[in-house]
A protein has these predicted regions:
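Core catalytic lobe of class I
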Residues: 1-176
Length: 176
């Protein structure tokens, strides 16, 4: 599986613009009563073909099914890995800053050295509710955990400009 993903993302690397980025939503899982650290194993594979890991974001989900087969713990988050092709990559961080005057005032008073008039930078923990299966429309594949439209829009806003090309190698089946 990892070798297949490595090959896919190596091919994507060759057609990505120099300032391009890559977003992957991925999770750990259990096999033979042990956690498989798939996100971190994948990072190593992608580094070997040139991708540079820039951020690890936690998508805190509002609901899920039990993580283990016995229901010991619920997995309430997934990893969102943000890669770039080169060190100088496109980012529109000012477009996604949080500008809520009530939140901003509290934040600014507590951390005045971090004040930015354009708003507060995004946190590394994102909270987006999971859409109901089929909420993207009847023509879409029913995915076990569809990505929230708002989360996808945030990713696109961060890393693209109007008229840029966004490529989803898995055709909306669960990967961005």
């Amino acid at each position: 599986y990892l070798e297949d993903l490595k090959e896919i993302f190596a091919q994507i690397y060759t057609v990505t613009k120099d300032d391009g980025t890559l977003w992957i939503v991925i999770d750990t899982f259990k096999r033979d009563h042990a956690v498989v650290t798939l996100p971190f194993d994948l990072v190593q594979k992608l580094n070997s073909v040139g991708w540079k890991l820039q951020e690890i974001i936690i998508w805190k989900k509002d609901k899920t099914v039990p993580w283990s087969s016995k229901g010991f713990m619920q997995r309430k988050f997934e990893y969102v890995l943000f890669f770039s092709k080169q060190n100088n990559y496109k980012t529109n961080k000012d477009q996604v800053r949080i500008y809520d005057t009530q939140q901003l005032k509290k934040w600014w008073v507590k951390y005045p050295e971090r004040y930015n008039p354009k708003g507060k930078a995004l946190d590394e923990i994102w909270e987006f509710p999971i859409p109901v299966q089929g909420s993207w429309g009847t023509e879409y594949i029913r995915h076990f955990c569809p990505l929230p439209k708002e989360m996808v829009a945030t990713m696109i806003s961060i890393s693209t400009d109007e008229e840029d090309v966004v490529f989803d190698p898995f055709a909306g089946s669960g990967a961005v």
